[in-house]
Amino acid sequence: MIQSHVSVMLNEMLEALSPKAGESYLDCTFGAGGYSKAILESCNCYVTALDRDPNVIKRAEEIQQSYGERFDFVETNFADSFAKLKEKKFDGIVLDLGVSSMQLDIADRGFSFLHNGPLDMRMSGQGLSAEEFVNAAEEKELADVIYKYGDESFSRRIAKRIVEYRKTARIDSTSKLAEIVRSSIGFRKGKIDPATKTFQAIRIYVNDELGELEQFLVNVKNILKKDGRLVVVSFHSLEDRIVKNFFKENSEKPVVRSKYAKDDMTIDPNKWLKIITNKALAPSDKEVGLNIRARSAKLRAAKAIYE
């Protein structure tokens, strides 16, 4: 059964973004449009949405019909969006780094071990597919990718089993890969599926998700107005670490000054952010109970204090 997409930490995102009438916002990961729609409904503002997945265009057109000129969609990944945005600046930017249920639950996309389909996993349908990677990579490279991007302690065992299997048959479906992983480390009922981390790791690798996030953050200052807010929802520790470090490196530590101090404070233009969330916010127990895919989400937000 295909699960309809439920946006994660929607209320927390809106509170952190704080949309205002007349202002412009950038939804960098449109997906099923949950964030874009919520922002548009919150006040009489404008939203530009980005996504590299051509399968979401129909949903974007539906939202455009409802909100007219207040909504615009650009087919691109967020790392390559700067040229297409043509130096436009925004009052707020939001990134939801998770894979939408719409992508996970369609078997032909090859993202999920729960639905048998071709082993693809490409967001845009272009570039190296998961099938090509799994069937061509050396055992060490497979192990390194599964360990680095999936934090999988059994990565070497899984990689060895993959290489052994493909000597007899090509690994061309999600079910085949999932069974190989499960047989490598065992499957205990009631626990998180053993294939979870391996599928996550391969998806991150073939889509260069961490590289794109880092590239976007390096350039985001150029499209965020003064006092504009940057809100990021991540779903695993590698993403969260990148966002946390970026916020830390580009923000001043709070300084308590005496009201009698006479010297002027030194302004460092490289410290252009003020962190809004001192610690990453997590979804409520109630939300996780309603949507298990929210369990690993973390939200961080910061505000631009200089342009």
Swiss-Prot record:
S-adenosyl-L-methionine binds at G33, G34, Y35, D51, F82, D96, Q103. Its main location: cytoplasm. HAMAP family: 16SrRNA_methyltr_H. It holds the Pfam family Methyltransf_5. InterPro entries: RsmH (IPR002903), SAM-dep_MeTrfase_MraW_recog (IPR023397), SAM-dependent_MTases_sf (IPR029063). Specifically methylates the N4 position of cytidine in position 1402 (C1402) of 16S rRNA. Transmembrane segments: none annotated. The keyword Transferase applies. Belongs to the methyltransferase superfamily. RsmH family. This is Ribosomal RNA small subunit methyltransferase H. It catalyses: cytidine(1402) in 16S rRNA + S-adenosyl-L-methionine = N(4)-methylcytidine(1402) in 16S rRNA + S-adenosyl-L-homocysteine + H(+). Keywords: Cytoplasm, Methyltransferase, rRNA processing, S-adenosyl-L-methionine, Transferase.
